[in-house]
Amino acid sequence: MVKQKQVCIIGAGVSGLAAAKAFLARGHHVTVVERSGDLGGVWEPARSYPDVQTQSPKDLYRYTDRGMPRSYPEWPTGPQVHAYLADYARDYGIKRLIRFNTAVLQMNRRPDSIPGWKLDLRGTDSHITQENFDFVVVCTGQFNEPQVISHPGKDTFETQGGRILHSSQYNDAAIAKGRKVVVLGGSKSATDIAVNAVNAGASDVTLVYRRPVWRCPYFIGGLINFKRIFYTRALEAMFRSGSVASLLRFTQAVAKPLVWVSWRGLESLLKLQLKLTKCDMVPDERVEDGVNCSVPIATPGFFPMVADGRIKAIRGSFDHYDGKTIVMTGSERIIADLVVLATGYRIGVPFLPQTFRDNLVDPDGQYRLYRLIANPDLPDLGFVGFNSSFCTVLCADMAANWLVRYADGQLAYQPTKDEMHKIIDMMLHF
């Protein structure tokens, strides 16, 4: 008989909802704390930029027990994803368990050697309370704290009328109209915002990026849905595996020339379709080295806009602001009214004391997590959504269901602490 636990889920995004449902379904008492005023995480309307849509098709960006509505397009928009998540939370009784506008300030082990954690929570009235839980699931994921980079001269730039936003704050296209917009970053959000700014009537749009990366169009060759190529066992077999099985090594060695030709063919097709040579945005690395657990989607319209000059793409980075001018590291100067920092997010668990973080994170920033879910040195604690994958929602769903069984000691094979450390070391080395 499994003891019912008091479980705290930190975060009400994609991963938090999956974790809440998994623990709720197995009879545990669940509390979800969410620091913002709405659920959805990156899909929360206040954090979503205009025209955002999924990179994965709707039949893969979904929970295992609830598909997206048939009326949704192949790649749903931000508002559609948020509606899907809201309906999911309502229908499975999760929304009533969420405490919105509640932040976790700190968590520590419970006193007197009692299993579990004590959390310091700050609610809507700014009052701080302490609550004990038997198990905690961290679902703050990879997109938690905006990574805001500050450059010298920032204050003067803003004093003279310039505006600087993080990409998560670019939620109204009207702010780009008539402005000279500079986007810093090379991610999907950066190219999305650059295209949106052009369509919104910006007088000038510049994208500043460090290096070009391989991107995949929604339809390869204009005909084939990219999932028919990238979401297949055939493509998976083209990557080097962590397995040491003799037969697998032999098979990969025999197929190596064919695999090499296949990758070069894909590179040629992408260069041609996306006009990478004309845009001077051909990546230096091979496509198979750039495509790992994820590959950014080519924003529709981005490369044509670079090719015809509507978007100016400059390789480099900011050095400092000089009045209303951005001075690049190579001394090039760009006049700007609006700067959008598409510089990503910081991955972290700031509410976890440093002593515990030292067990969780290697000096090089890698998380020591078995199956990217649990750390053997941090009992009564799990993580959902800390992996990078083509299928974010499906992975969160599977991780949550594995974690609840791990917490209950009901896995078909419950790994020992030493076994978990061994697998973690192997995966980090790989």
What is each stretch, according to the model?
Residues V2-D51, Q55, G67-G221, K256-M420:
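Flavin (primarily FAD) cofactor-binding/catalytic cores of flavoenzymes
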Residues R47-R70, F226-M238:
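N-terminal glycine-rich dinucleotide-binding loop that anchors FAD/FMN and/or NAD(P) in oxidoreductases
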Residues Y231-W260:
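Alpha/beta-hydrolase-fold enzymes
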Residues D418-F430:
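Mid-to-C-terminal Rossmann-like scaffold of FAD/NAD(P)H-dependent oxidoreductases
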